[in-house]
Amino acid sequence: MNDLIKPSSFEDELNTIISLFQGTSNNTEGCTPLVPSTIEERAKQRVHNEEILRQSNIEDVIKGAAERLAQDEGGIKTHPVNEDWLRQFKNNVQDISEKEMKLIWSKVLAGEMKQPRSFSIRTLHLLGKLSKEDADVITKIAPFTLSDDSGRRMIIHSDMDEDDFFKFDDLLFLNELGLIETSATLHMNWHFDKNVSDFSNCIKLNNGNVGININLNEKAYGIPVYTVTMIGNQIFSLIEEVIPRTDYYKRIIDKLYFKGKCVCGHIKDVGDDNGFVFSDSIFSIDKIA
């Protein structure tokens, strides 16, 4: 729709609101008259304009998904998508007008076509309720997350003041959305076959191409975390161009109690049970002594 003319009076503002409700704008040439003569005509006009806008929203998202799939190098084999899923997708996406949110929905559709069941119907319902401002909070927190080699996503925490990096209110907000669990008693636990003396028991964590190896000699170790839920994992995966906050990782891991060493760097190879292979080192922490 064309940009609205700024109202010069309350009457103009009222007419502008009415025109928005009907899907028209006062400065659109050739549009249907603002107030048709009968309620039946006004209802038909509103439904007509609303459905045109909805169809436009759906087609914008489909086009975005097609462009995303076309950009994948080497071509991508797509798979049939469940009809119930598609119906729920359409019902949610038809009322999405924000450009930034349309891009997110395009990524959802492309991801589901490449790998069905990547995004649950529950995730679609939650995503459909998110505003751009909500998405901005998720984007703000994404750089502080880490995933282990099984895909479990988390935010490590300790006694430090996290407000130096993010507001705890943001985490509480994501907790209310059902994306993370903020209970202070939660720990992520790792178990190894045996105690070792060479610190070869390794916890591997990463955020994109930034990885962390925490090498221990203990058979079991637990880290205090805020855990990301299944729906949270799916929604966080939609955030692109995340720049991991390695300054946070360094400070928070240095606060943890363990005997061993930690190295953070850019991942060159996923390596093996002994840790990632790095192309460089971003920071290291030695707690062997």
Feature locations, PLM:
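Extended, compositionally biased alpha-helical segments that mediate assembly or anchoring
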Residues: 7, 251-289
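Short acidic, hydrophobic short linear motifs in intrinsically disordered regions
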Residues: 140-172
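Short, solvent-exposed secondary-structure capping/transition elements
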Residues: 117-118, 135, 139, 147-155, ...
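Short, amphipathic alpha-helical interaction segments positioned at domain boundaries
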Residues: 98, 190-252
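Non-transmembrane, amphipathic alpha-helical segments
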Residues: 89-93, 122, 126, 159
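Short amphipathic alpha-helical interaction segments
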Residues: 81, 160-212
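Short alpha-helical segments that sit at the start of domains
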Residues: 102-145
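Eukaryotic partner-binding/assembly regions in large regulatory complexes
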Residues: 3-115, 286
